[in-house]
């Protein structure tokens, strides 16, 4: 499947309706790396009924116990950090679940949701995220439908994404993405998509934390014109004010990205898909294969 | 006080022996922004007996309740996000504590540790961090003494820091700092010190997560030579192997930073201080005032 075809599957992924049965628990721990880990990051920002703790490492925290819902996410099912963390969680009698398309993780005896294989992990974000949303948030059908519609529209018209990609390409810019709650993790998702799809270094940060550090160099850093600041528009007046004032006092003109949609679910997926197309177009302009992650595979082999 | 004099106070700060009395709790929530927020970030990486949740925003998660130890950290005591979060926590009957040098936060009736005023918040990291360490970890006297000794040595000899600063200055490089557990937060601390002290944009990331995204562009990104990769050496073989292999397959030569010390506390403070001097020297070379954060102050006024 071509990468552009992978992108067309996202709209259907939001209709993926599997969920876990969970018992009594007082905290959730989600383990996952890279493209699989993003699902946990996004979920942890939109759910706060119980503490959600993310593990993107080999080891799990001491507090994991039999009151912990532990969810291991690995698209391939063979991510060594996630396998290691899951084994530790099982030893501590956590209630371990898994989301994977196969691999070792699917054979460890955990309560597992199997998702379709054949995609890049980062192109399966709907399959990876929706089981979390279905289990703990239970979205309205209308919200899922709205997300489906917005994703379909983005598939048909992504001229704005293409135009931003051109600007970045022409200036050989270093993309920096600024989000704000509840889209901090999406800003990070864009950073990783720039990395993996377009093979350019990119960074993300978020309001208002960045007003306590990035703000100083935004005015007087060297190489300032080499950066390209993409900022998600916020309908929270506390953040929108900070964005406007930051632009003004640092003498920058941010490229604002409108967040379309009315439900949170639709907004999240709309923004995700915007970043998918933006980085896909940049890959095309650069003449690099957006699917190619051979270096990451090579690294996995060398350290195994 | 000159910035260089502020740096000389750090060794004494690690001997700051105040702590909170805590009752029964099942989770810890720490609120703080920027230079004050770093203390929570560092603490959350070295303590895992109970879940630690960080708040760097106006609002607190729904799960905050009367079993929550809530610690508000604001050097000035006037950080609007932290004040807002603390008020919300008090309403939810969390056990609220504060660490501050004064301001509104000191007058809100919380159980408060007052720390010396007159420093930049980022230069008071010892005062901000040690109450957390003293309360929940209880360091050995020998570890505190080791940290004191290493910091004193760094105060007397920071030639290596100066030499790295020169390289970065001469190439007008964009610093990127790669850490690994338990020093991920220190990598972020360095990023913020580059921002606030030297007024240059800088970024941080950590192993092994970065092997799932940054690794691709590390080989073929445009502008590759403009970056300067600082990597903390790790004595965890899983990370040290990843560092070596990443360098090799991406064709980069990282500037490795040795982590001196034997106790974790000493290592943490040694690395913090290394970054302090490195960014201070870069500020000097650039001819900018490391103490100047007038833009951040201006922003605070404009949004108030």
From Swiss-Prot, chains A, B:
It holds the Pfam family bact-PGI_C. It comes from Thermoplasma volcanium (strain ATCC 51530 / DSM 4299 / JCM 9571 / NBRC 15438 / GSS1). The active site is at residues 196, 212, 300. Residues 16-147 form the SIS domain. One of its GO terms (biological process) is carbohydrate metabolic process. Keywords: Carbohydrate metabolism, Isomerase. This is Bifunctional phosphoglucose/phosphomannose isomerase. Dual specificity isomerase that catalyzes the isomerization of both glucose-6-phosphate and mannose-6-phosphate to fructose-6-phosphate. SUPFAM superfamilies: SIS domain (SSF53697). The lineage of its organism: Archaea, Methanobacteriati, Thermoplasmatota, Thermoplasmata, Thermoplasmatales. It is an enzyme of class 5 (isomerase). Homodimer. Disulfide bonds: none annotated. It catalyses: alpha-D-glucose 6-phosphate = beta-D-fructose 6-phosphate; D-mannose 6-phosphate = D-fructose 6-phosphate. Belongs to the PGI/PMI family. One of its GO terms (molecular function) is carbohydrate derivative binding. The keyword Ribonucleoprotein does not apply. Its EC number is 5.3.1.8, 5.3.1.9. D-fructose 6-phosphate binds at residues 35-36, 74, 76, 79, 122, 212, 300. It comes from the Archaea.
């Amino acid at each position: 499947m071509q990468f552009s075809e992978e992108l067309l599957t996202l709209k259907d992924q939001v209709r993926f309706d599997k969920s876990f049965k969970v018992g009594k628990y007082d905290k959730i721990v989600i383990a996952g790396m890279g493209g699989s880990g993003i699902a946990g990051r996004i979920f942890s920002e939109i759910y706060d009924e119980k503490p959600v703790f993310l593990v993107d490492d080999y080891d799990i925290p001491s507090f994991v116990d039999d009151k912990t819902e532990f969810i291991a996410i690995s698209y391939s099912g063979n991510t060594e950090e996630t396998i290691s963390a899951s084994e530790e969680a099982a030893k501590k009698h956590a209630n371990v679940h898994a989301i994977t398309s196969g691999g070792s993780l699917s054979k460890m005896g955990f309560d597992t949701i199997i998702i379709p294989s054949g995609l890049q992990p980062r192109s399966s974000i709907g399959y990876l995220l929706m089981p979390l949303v279905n289990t703990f948030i239970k979205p309205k059908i209308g919200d899922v439908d709205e997300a489906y519609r917005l994703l379909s529209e983005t598939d048909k018209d992504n001229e704005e994404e293409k135009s931003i990609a051109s600007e970045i390409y022409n200036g050989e810019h270093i993309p920096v993405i600024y989000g704000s709650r509840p889209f901090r993790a999406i800003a990070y998702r864009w950073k990783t998509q720039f990395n993996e799809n377009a093979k350019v270094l990119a960074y993300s940060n978020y309001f208002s934390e960045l007003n306590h550090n990035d703000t100083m160099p935004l005015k007087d850093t060297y190489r300032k014109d080499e950066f390209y600041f993409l900022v998600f528009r916020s309908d929270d007046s506390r953040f929108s004010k900070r964005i406007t004032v930051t632009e003004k006092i640092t003498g920058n003109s941010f490229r604002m990205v409108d967040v379309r949609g009315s439900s949170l679910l639709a907004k999240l997926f709309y923004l995700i898909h915007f970043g998918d197309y933006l980085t896909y177009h940049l890959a095309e302009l650069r003449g690099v294969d957006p699917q190619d992650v051979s270096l990451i595979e090579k690294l996995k082999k060398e350290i195994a």
